[in-house]
Amino acid sequence: MKKRNIVTAVFGTAVLAGAGLYQKTSQFVDERLYRTHIKRTLFETLKPQTVRIKNMNDAILTGHLLEVDHVDNTLIMVHGFTKDASSLENEAIYFQSICPHTNILMIDCYGNGSSDGVTRGVGFQDVMDINYWNRFI
């Protein structure tokens, strides 16, 4: 009887530990892959148009476009590592002042800002994503 109680206690503890681990793993995956904890409101001063495209892996990439009527030139701005397009707001205001006849596209790289994915280093995939933005323009 005593042995049975010990086995039951060990088994119950293992099940509870497994359930707790599953919950923490699910929470971590949701935050890193789907990034449900991120607030999606950006830009205090500028009111850009939000545009979305898919890259070659079908991940949705988000950009924020400051569009000027009857203009063919577009400046693509890329944020720093682990930041997002809203970190470019001051620079966008500056470029608007010196290049008033230019559209400005501030992009959220893969895994940053409102774009899908997990943050990774800057590399070949990011270059390919910028090529997709060039095609969008």
Would you name each region that the model predicts?
Residues 86-89, 114-120:
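Active-site lumenal/periplasmic loops and adjacent helix-entry segments of GT-C-fold
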Residues 5-54:
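An N-terminal hydrophobic leader/cap segment in hydrolases
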Residues 56-67:
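A short loop-to-beta-strand scaffold at the N-terminal edge of the catalytic core in hydrolase folds
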Residues 72-80:
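Short beta-strand element of the alpha/beta-hydrolase
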Residues 62, 79, 112:
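Histidine-centered divalent metal-coordination motifs
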Residues 92-116:
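Conserved alpha/beta-hydrolase
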Residues 81-95:
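The serine-hydrolase catalytic nucleophile loop
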Residues 120-137:
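Alpha/beta-hydrolase active-site loop
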